[in-house]
C-alpha cells in the first residue's frame, strides 16, 4: 500500500506540474553551422554554460541564400536547441561570439506545449535568467 500511495503522489505531482506549464516558457532555437565539428563545439558550450538543455545536430542540410548580391548554396548542419525563452538573448550572444560566420543564423520559436516531463526537464537543466 505505501508503494501505491507513493506512486500516486508522484503521478499527481507530475500532472500538477504539467498543468502549470505556461506556453512560451521554453523556446527552440535554430542555428546553422558549416560543419558537424563547429556545431558540436557550439552545442557543448551551450549545454556546459546552462544555456541549453539539449542540442540536436542534424546533418546534410542544404542552404540556398543571397549573399553580397550572389545566390549561394552551401552544405551545412542545423542545430535544434531547447532552452528557456528568458535565456535566448544570452544564447544568441554565445553563438555570435563562437560562430565562424560574419552573420550567423539564430532564430527561435516559442514552445506552446509538449511532453510535460520533458518540459520540466528543460526547466531543471536551464536555470531562469539571473
Mark where each language-model region is:
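Positively charged, small/polar-rich N-terminal and surface patches that mediate targeting and assembly
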Residues: 1-130
